């Protein structure tokens, strides 16, 4: 009887008995989101969106504001933790066929794009050397768009170069986008619980479900605790581990850093961009590296949902993971051989995974029917 009442109370949350730890990342992302909003709100009270004062305001926060250094480092390292969780969440979705819940997957991919935009705007705000030059390089890609590119870039910058209006609007966007993320997250969660989550076997779990609370609540609390402990240990002992040394210097438009690169969580897309020696081609590849996730629900041809019983796609999946790491690594290196060649080969393999999905599904059908 208590279990029935609990199921009624959490009526939208009957969950498969066999979901593993890979299903805990949703609650971890929700925790990250709440942490980022709270620390970001605290930081915004002391931040000044002005090119002459932004860098000084960050120093003021870390030195003079009570516990400001904790807030600043929690926000910066929390962003990295957010992306670690979201990349693992996407990897789980690809492996276990979560993309077959079309609406949930499409809303989730939209969330990823919004999150990347928010993180990019946030990276510019300290107005350090790497912040300024990363913003210059990435926003300048808009000029590759035929006819409209130059006008769009001037509109985004608020002038003919990155200046005070650019920083002001980036701060405004960085502040407002998280509220959009929260709204789309709510839609994402509602869509997810309309169909119900999958399970490692990729089978229908309607006949074997248990209430979310208390069984999965404790699993979630355990993983959230591990994440928060890791975050606090990093903030306490290695607060600058994710920072670029160039960003400890104030932005100087007259001095170009030897090697311009964005934060680590954008390096895979940046590596794909750099691997193509053409501005428009590189910009298209950069956009497609994310947008190609939208195609997954429409290119699935296998009768099996999960990769658990699909060895060919399993091989391609782990190749994709290795490729992701390799592109991230090559993007930190100078644009010279052998790094350019490695990056180009890895980029081709990255897109091959998504293109091979329907072909390997069809091939597996043939092999299964033949046997």
From Swiss-Prot:
Required co-factors: heme b
Molecular-function GO terms, alphabetical: metal ion binding; ubiquinol-cytochrome-c reductase activity
Pfam families: Cytochrom_B_C, Cytochrome_B
Annotated heme b b562 binding sites: 75, 174
Record localization: Mitochondrion inner membrane
PROSITE patterns (alphabetical): CYTB_CTER (PS51003), CYTB_NTER (PS51002)
Co-factor note (free text): Binds 2 heme b groups non-covalently.
One GO cellular component term: respiratory chain complex III
Official protein name in the record: Cytochrome b
Native species: Candoia aspera
Lineage: Eukaryota, Metazoa, Chordata, Craniata, Vertebrata
């Amino acid at each position: 009887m208590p279990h029935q009442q609990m199921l009624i109370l959490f009526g939208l949350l009957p969950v498969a008995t066999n979901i593993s730890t890979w299903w805990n990342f949703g609650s971890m992302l929700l925790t990250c989101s709440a942490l980022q909003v709270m620390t970001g709100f605290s930081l915004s009270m002391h931040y000044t969106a002005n090119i002459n004062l932004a860098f000084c305001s960050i120093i003021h926060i870390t030195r003079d504001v009570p516990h400001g250094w904790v807030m600043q480092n929690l926000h910066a390292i929390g962003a990295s933790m957010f992306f670690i969780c979201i990349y693992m969440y996407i990897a789980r979705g690809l492996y276990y066929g979560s993309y077959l819940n079309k609406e949930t997957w499409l809303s989730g991919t939209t969330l990823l794009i919004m999150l990347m935009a928010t993180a990019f705007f946030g990276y510019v705000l300290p107005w350090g050397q790497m912040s300024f030059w990363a913003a210059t390089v990435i926003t300048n890609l808009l000029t590759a768009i035929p006819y409209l590119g130059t006008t769009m870039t001037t509109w985004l910058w608020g002038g003919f170069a990155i200046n005070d209006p650019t920083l002001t609007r980036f701060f405004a966007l960085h502040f407002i986008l998280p509220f959009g993320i929260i709204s789309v997250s709510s839609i994402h969660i509602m869509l997810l619980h309309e169909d119900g989550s999958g399970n490692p076997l990729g089978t229908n779990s309607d006949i074997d479900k248990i209430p979310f609370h208390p069984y999965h609540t404790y699993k979630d609390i355990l993983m959230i605790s591990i994440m928060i402990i890791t975050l606090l240990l990093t903030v306490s002992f290695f607060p600058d581990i994710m920072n670029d040394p160039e960003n400890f210097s104030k932005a100087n438009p007259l001095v170009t850093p030897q090697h311009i690169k964005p934060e680590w969580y954008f390096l895979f897309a940046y590596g794909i961009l750099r691997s193509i020696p053409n501005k428009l081609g590189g910009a298209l590849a950069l956009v497609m590296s994310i947008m190609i996730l939208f195609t997954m629900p429409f290119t699935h041809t296998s009768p099996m949902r999960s990769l658990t019983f699909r060895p060919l796609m399993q091989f391609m999946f782990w190749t994709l993971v290795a490729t992701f790491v390799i592109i991230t690594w090559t993007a930190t290196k100078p644009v010279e051989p052998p790094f350019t060649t490695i990056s180009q080969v890895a980029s081709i393999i990255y897109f091959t995974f998504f293109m091979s999905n329907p072909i390997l599904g069809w091939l597996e059908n043939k092999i299964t029917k033949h046997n």
